[in-house]
Structure formats: structure tokens, C-alpha cells
């Protein structure tokens, strides 16, 4: 009987005692003190839960605001980019029986640097660099194609590579590289050189190792183009130079955007297209290093500043995806390559293009380039 009654009543206090209203015992008296403590405990628990709930709400609001801000910045950047319907025709090579090499996990984006011209007119690209995002090996790769390469341009015959850009813009340039080297290029980006100064300035400038002649070249171009009143803005005589591993005497100098652009375009001091391509790769590598350590606010500033100078064949959604891939790849190993290699070309005077770089062994050039882009 007692057992049944005990099972029917509630444990009002959560203390293991079962007391009903009709029962008075020593245990009901003992339970009076825990009742007050239990009530206080429940109040404290409610207050703690209320605080946690409010804290979580605040955190959620902060996250939503941050995400909204990020999306707003991304939206602004995407709206400021220029989009083109000039699409490369990959069939140009494939119709000639050429199989274009591609691989899952490897994205190839061709970057063209040009001076701004009137709408509908393409000048000759001063820089042609293939950016490869290799997620199979966690590597970010750069390949420079020298503009004086003497190649077959589909529909035009043999000419310098940068002539393809003048004849048919980025689409024909991509088709030319695919035709001659048998690699598939997924997308392309055109960057107006005017944006380069904004990129570098937004990042706070670049520290580069320069020779005496390179410093003098920057000063000379800056002065002759009336970008400074001083003939020796940097003044090569103010620095001490140390021998580096390449056998050159160099000094580290902080360059602003304008000065870094002259450095990247220099083909006079050290004197060849090979040297200029090397400088361009070094500048890009330094910019990537700066982007890697930049905070989100600076990255946003760079994106907003540069986007009006960018033209691409990608859709806004594709730009977002490629940008995310590139940002993720900033922490990967970076490698560089150049076409042609120094042991696989010769200089030749041509009737239509003047002095040009002719590849000695085309099959070797294709194999080595394919191995660099798609191999480990």
C-alpha cells in the first residue's frame, strides 16, 4: 500500500523524497530547506540560460552582418568588372587533330596585361602569364610566354605571339597558345596596366631587390614621362649593393605602384624579353605574398579599386569561384616557368615580324610545358 502511494506522488524537489499534501512527516520538514535552495537554483539556471541565449543571438547577428558585408563587397566588385563574350574556340586546335591536355583539379587562367585602348581595339599585350591552380599538388604556378615568340597564329600564319592579341584579342591569343602547345586554357583575364599601380599602392608598395641599372631605369622613365619633378627620385647612388646568388649586385628598395610598373616593364637594363618576363613573374610573386598576409579589409579595398580595370570571359559566378580558389591557393607552394626555355630557341630575322624567337624543338617544348603544368 505504501509502495503504491509512493509511486503516485511526485518528487516535487528533485531530491529523491516523495511527499503528498496529506502526509506530514519528518521528511516533509527536512524538505522545506531544499525547496528554497532548489527555487534559487532554478532562477540561477534560468538567468544563465537567458544570458547564453542573448549571447548566441548577438553572435548570430554579428555573423549575419559580417556575411552581409562580405556579400556586399563581393557584389560591388562583381558589378565593377567588365565582362566580354569574346570566347576562345577550342575546336580550332581540335579540328586539326590536336588533343588539348586538361586534368581534373587543375585550372588554367591566362592573364593578359595591356595598356588601355579605345573600346573594340586591342593593342599588343605586354605581358602574357598563365596562372595554374593545381589543387592536386597544392601548387600555384606561373608560366610566362614571351611576346616575341614566333608561332603559328590560326587564320593568319606565322607571326609574333603578341601579334595574335592585336589581330584577335585574348580569344585568338588563347587559341594560338592552345594550337602550338596543346594545353587547354580554361578562362582568361585582361588587366589594364593602369590598375597595376592601384594594386601595389593598395598593398602598401613592394620591396624588391634591384640592380643599380634597374634603379636608374625607373628614375629615368618616371622623369621623362613627367611623373616626378626629380631626375633621381630613388637615386641609385644612395644605396649599397650586395652580390646575390645569380651573380648580380642588388639592393632592396621599397617601390610604389608607379615605380613597380616601370620595373616590371623594363626590357632595357639587363636587356632582353627574358629579363622582363622574369621581372614580371617576380613582381606577381611579391604581390601574391602581400595578398597572402593582407587582412580582409585590405583585400576588399584592392578588389574594389582594381575591378574596373579587369575584363574577363568568365561569368560573375565563375569569377567568384575562381577568386575563392586563388585565395585558397595563396598558402601553397609557388613555382615559375618560361616559354621558351633558354636551351630551346634561337633568334631569327623574319620578313614580317623582324627579329623573333623561334623554338628549336617544338615537341620538347610541349612535353616540358605539359609536365610543369599538369605534373607534380
Each PLM stretch: what is its role?
Residues 121-125, 155-156, 164-172, 190-194, ...:
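Soluble non-cytosolic domains of exported or imported proteins
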Residues 116-120, 159-167, 182-187, 266-275, ...:
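Second-shell loop/turn segments in exported
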Residues 201-298, 375:
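Flexible, polar/acidic helix-loop-strand segments at domain edges
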Residues 104-107, 123-128, 137-145, 156-158, ...:
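Extracytoplasmic
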Residues 95-99, 118, 149, 153, ...:
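C-terminal solvent-exposed extensions
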Residues 1-45:
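N-terminal targeting leaders characterized by basic, low-complexity, disordered sequences
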Residues 2-3, 8, 45-138, 258, ...:
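Entry/capping segment at the start of metal-dependent catalytic domains
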Residues 94-98, 111-118, 124-129, 163-178, ...:
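N-terminal post-signal-peptidase region of extra-cytosolic proteins
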Amino acid at each position: 500500500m505504501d509502495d503504491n502511494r509512493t509511486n503516485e506522488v511526485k518528487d516535487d524537489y528533485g531530491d529523491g523524497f516523495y511527499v503528498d499534501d496529506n502526509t506530514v512527516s519528518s521528511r516533509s520538514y527536512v524538505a522545506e530547506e531544499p525547496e528554497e535552495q532548489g527555487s534559487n537554483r532554478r532562477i540561477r539556471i534560468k538567468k544563465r540560460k537567458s544570458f547564453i541565449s542573448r549571447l548566441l543571438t548577438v553572435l548570430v547577428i554579428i555573423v549575419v552582418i559580417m556575411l552581409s558585408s562580405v556579400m556586399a563587397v563581393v557584389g560591388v566588385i562583381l558589378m565593377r568588372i567588365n565582362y566580354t563574350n569574346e570566347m576562345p574556340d577550342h575546336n580550332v586546335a581540335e579540328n586539326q587533330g590536336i588533343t588539348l591536355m586538361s586534368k581534373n583539379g587543375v585550372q588554367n587562367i591566362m592573364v593578359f596585361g595591356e595598356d588601355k585602348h579605345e573600346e573594340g581595339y586591342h593593342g599588343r599585350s605586354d605581358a602574357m602569364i598563365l596562372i595554374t591552380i593545381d589543387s592536386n599538388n597544392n601548387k600555384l604556378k606561373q608560366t610566362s610566354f614571351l611576346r616575341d615568340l614566333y608561332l603559328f597564329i590560326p587564320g593568319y600564319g606565322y607571326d609574333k605571339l603578341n601579334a595574335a592579341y592585336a589581330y584577335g584579342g585574348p580569344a585568338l591569343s588563347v587559341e594560338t597558345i592552345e594550337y602550338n602547345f596543346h594545353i587547354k586554357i580554361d578562362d582568361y583575364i585582361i588587366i589594364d596596366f593602369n590598375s597595376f599601380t592601384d594594386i601595389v599602392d593598395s598593398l602598401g608598395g613592394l620591396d624588391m631587390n634591384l640592380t643599380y641599372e634597374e634603379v636608374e631605369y625607373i628614375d629615368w622613365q618616371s622623369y621623362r614621362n613627367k611623373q616626378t619633378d626629380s631626375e633621381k627620385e630613388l637615386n641609385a647612388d644612395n644605396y649599397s649593393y650586395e652580390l646575390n646568388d645569380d651573380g648580380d649586385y642588388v639592393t632592396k628598395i621599397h617601390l610604389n605602384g608607379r615605380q613597380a610598373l616601370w620595373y616590371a616593364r623594363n626590357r632595357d637594363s639587363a636587356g632582353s624579353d627574358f629579363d622582363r618576363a622574369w621581372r614580371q613573374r617576380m613582381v606577381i610573386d611579391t604581390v601574391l605574398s602581400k595578398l597572402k598576409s593582407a587582412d580582409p579589409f585590405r583585400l576588399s579595398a584592392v578588389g574594389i579599386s582594381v575591378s574596373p580595370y579587369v575584363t574577363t570571359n568568365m561569368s560573375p559566378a565563375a569569377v567568384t569561384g575562381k577568386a575563392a580558389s586563388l585565395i585558397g591557393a595563396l598558402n601553397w607552394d609557388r613555382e615559375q616557368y618560361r616559354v621558351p626555355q633558354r636551351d630551346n630557341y634561337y633568334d631569327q630575322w623574319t620578313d614580317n615580324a623582324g627579329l623573333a624567337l623561334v623554338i628549336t624543338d617544338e615537341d620538347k617544348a610541349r612535353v616540358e610545358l605539359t609536365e610543369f603544368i599538369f605534373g607534380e
